[in-house]
Amino acid sequence: MTNLLKKFNEQQMQVLAKEVPEFRPGDDLKVTFKVVDSTSERIQIFEGVCISKRNRGLHSSFAVRKVSHGESIVSQFFIYSPALVSVQVTRRGKVRRAKLYYLCKLFGKAARIKERATYKNNKSN
């Protein structure tokens, strides 16, 4: 029974596969997704800090936090959801935790995250 479920999940992951960049908690993300109203469908952009990432195969998801009008908004996105259009990493953050839920209580300068340095591999032998 579990083999059938694993095979089904793997098939669905191949069908729903997308170009999702490598990102970690602490990174600033720009998530584009479809919003379906009763009569129309539109694309919306949610930009904020990734506060958690959950790798569970077909059920993989991540949470993004943004501050809008002084209120903290956390939104959960499934990586293999057909509603998810694209994910872009705008800035890499340097953190020491896998889950950054403590950021939900912080605002302004207290909620800042240091930028992670990225180096290019120079192999000029």
Swiss-Prot record:
<dbReference type="GO" id="GO:0003735">
    <property type="term" value="F:structural constituent of ribosome"/>
</dbReference>
<dbReference type="InterPro" id="IPR038657">
    <property type="entry name" value="Ribosomal_bL19_sf"/>
</dbReference>
<dbReference type="InterPro" id="IPR001857">
    <property type="entry name" value="Ribosomal_bL19"/>
</dbReference>
<dbReference type="GO" id="GO:0022625">
    <property type="term" value="C:cytosolic large ribosomal subunit"/>
</dbReference>
<protein>
    <recommendedName>
        <fullName>Large ribosomal subunit protein bL19</fullName>
    </recommendedName>
</protein>
<comment type="function">
    <text>This protein is located at the 30S-50S ribosomal subunit interface and may play a role in the structure and function of the aminoacyl-tRNA binding site.</text>
</comment>
<dbReference type="InterPro" id="IPR008991">
    <property type="entry name" value="Translation_prot_SH3-like_sf"/>
</dbReference>
<keyword id="KW-0687">Ribonucleoprotein</keyword>
<comment type="similarity">
    <text>Belongs to the bacterial ribosomal protein bL19 family.</text>
</comment>
<dbReference type="GO" id="GO:0006412">
    <property type="term" value="P:translation"/>
</dbReference>
<keyword id="KW-0689">Ribosomal protein</keyword>
<dbReference type="Pfam" id="PF01245">
    <property type="entry name" value="Ribosomal_L19"/>
</dbReference>
